[in-house]
Amino acid sequence: MILKLYNTRTKDFSELANFSDVKVYACGPTVYNYAHIGNFRTYIFGDLLIKTLRFLGYKVNYAMNITDIGHLTGDLDDGEDKVAKTAREKGLTVYEISKFFTEAFFKDCKKLNVVYPDKVLIASKHIPNMIEVIKILEEKKFTYFSNGNVYFDTSCFKSYGEMAGIDLIDKDMAFSRVDIDKFKRNKTDFVLWFTNSKFKDQEMKWDSPWGFGYPSWHLECAAMNLEYFKDTLDIHLGGVDHIGVHHINEIAIVECFLNKKWCDIFVHGEFLIMDYNKMSKSHGNFITVKGLEEQNFSPLDFRYLCLTSHYRNQLKFSFNNLKASKIARENMINRLSYFYASLDPADLNMLNKDLKNFGFSIEKEYYDSFVEKVSFDLNVSKGLALLWEVIKSENLGFVSKLKLAFIFDEIISLNLREEILKKSENHNIVIDENMKILLEERRIAKCEKNFKRADEIRDFFAKKGFVLIDTKEGTKVKRG
């Protein structure tokens, strides 16, 4: 089935018809600190996209950048270089800081089951290509040099700001609410290369035709895209906060470099909201993955919470909401574990074969419904609701329920099979002689239709913390 996504660029849904080589780029973290769970909501959304594409049969080439040079809060150069600031505070080099937090980021991604990119593009390793991009733009008269910095002249790019809904007439009004760099020709112009920064002790600088300096964030992403994907990109991912400045600047750089339209589909995820504001380090209202673990939550509890809301809707975070997600996830695993424990060896063997070889039409109906939901703008929250429908269905056997759960988990990624197997291993117990006598007495009682005695024995086991599960192969004893 073809995937449809809401395209920020067209304000409409776009179909991805090319299955053979889908090029996807995501704006990655600035590695000056631990990423917080607000950041990870966006990366979980990106993970759902990549896994859905592959689930549907697309061949995907997925790249993500790592901003290790620093990240100014604005083009005015009045924001602190975050990587350099952290390095000074900790008495380390910027390279040591960026390496540490890059590794920490991907460790947290692994805990959240966020897919590792096919290519990780580290900004500081691509400086020569960034310089070449500026040279070409300079030759084409899209740049100017002012006060030691190279600027992009947005007045030369007629469609500047279209994705963000900034009209040519309204551009000055849109940017009049912020302090403007007095060395700009136009309020929307932005720096490509800094040589005259107010941060004189910046460690990361490189020689260039315009002087010793460093690139802007917008140039980094644009140049690395051009270097890795050449002139074609199918999907660009990011958060909604990237729309109004970063992504429209990136479009301006690349399209002026290529002399053609670039990247048909831009997809943006909404904020995680805490205390009525977006979660951010600047607001001081952020929580890390480690912070969740310290409060006895699994990172997958947070992933479950993210699955309950569509990526284009803001998601309210609270510990009550997270606790509800934890309970729901554990309840799901417990129910599926019960189904698994009830299976005989022949049924268990079926779960190790091709899961999509459906033996019953109702299995195929549920599968098709799941595919339909995730194919339309990644409606994974409806897919999660469908999984609960499967679990509670009276028309599906245990094998069918487990098959569908394992298939759906290829996208929702809650480690369902692993959690069930772990629970099964932990719950298996050694049956002593007294237990064997009682189990045999119960078997005879059931054969003689003495269900009262059979239930009494079952209740006796329950009080001791055991669950009796009747199967074709006999009664299994599990810990409750």
From Swiss-Prot:
The cofactor binding remark recorded in the entry reads:
Binds 1 zinc ion per subunit.
Instruction: Give the subcellular location.
Output: Cytoplasm
Q: Which GO terms describe its biological process?
A: cysteinyl-tRNA aminoacylation
Question: Where along this sequence does the record place binding of ATP?
Answer: K281
Q: What is its main location?
A: cytoplasm
User: What GO annotations for molecular function exist for this entry?
Assistant: ATP binding; cysteine-tRNA ligase activity; zinc ion binding
Short motif ('KMSKS' region): ranges:
278-282
Catalysed reaction per UniProt? tRNA(Cys) + L-cysteine + ATP = L-cysteinyl-tRNA(Cys) + AMP + diphosphate
Class of enzymatic activity (EC top level):
ligase
Signal sequence, start to end:
none
Q: The motif 'HIGH' region: which residues? A: 29-39
Cofactor(s) needed, names only, are: Zn(2+)
Record carries keyword Electron transport: no
Name of protein: Cysteine--tRNA ligase
| Source species of the chain | Borrelia garinii subsp. bavariensis (strain ATCC BAA-2496 / DSM 23469 / PBi)
Question: What is the gene called?
Answer: cysS
